[in-house]
């Protein structure tokens, strides 16, 4: 389909702008990698790029098979290959998720929370409720994580809103229930992030495309101010649907007949990723879904992430009780 024909009928300004920008960016790069996850956002990215690419353009669609993937996702990857006539290159983790969890710790609540708690644990932090200056004297090489723990980031810092106070009662919970196991976000790094860097280096790409959206929220979306970033020492970064809101997604899907995996259409999941990831705020619902549709994966998730699930449940129960106390005081 000619690009002019693609954009001719587009009435949504966000979608129109994404086509124009994607065409400009793709045309001005020579070797491109595009991350494909089998999720809804990456489905749109793949469709969009296929609509703007010129014949012969070197584009590598890459899928990071973490080892904890729904069969529905694996099937969908094959469906995408057949639909668009492309090859989606599969890449395995540098370290498996079970090995990463065993070596570094389980993920808890969010990537950023896990990273901060991992840093504190690495310095044998005692989960103390002391002022920042006092703690910094005791743990002088852990400044950033201590700022998180003490809610000490400046309001001008882009991560201020993600200090520990962002998760209500989390500090109080940890003080009352210090973790007795290691916490880490390393499984994400070894299953996806570091793999992506390795692949891009080996392919010698000059552009990397990912399907992140600002509307997703969280620190990942908040840190991006533009859909395109150039780099002199590695590859440029492009986020084709960064500005898509949920209604833009739906409009695109309907306009261009974008089909999603059974994870959405049959299982009823809100989003996909590593199966049973403890970062999912609806992990209980997902566990029920896994047990129903892919029971072998359910057993694996319990064995790998069980400590994180239990700790999160305790935190949610603690939160509920603290909120009830606060409500009584206010009534």
Q: Where are each of the predicted segments found?
A:
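ATP-dependent adenylation/nucleotidyltransferase module used to activate substrates
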Residues: 2-248, 253-255
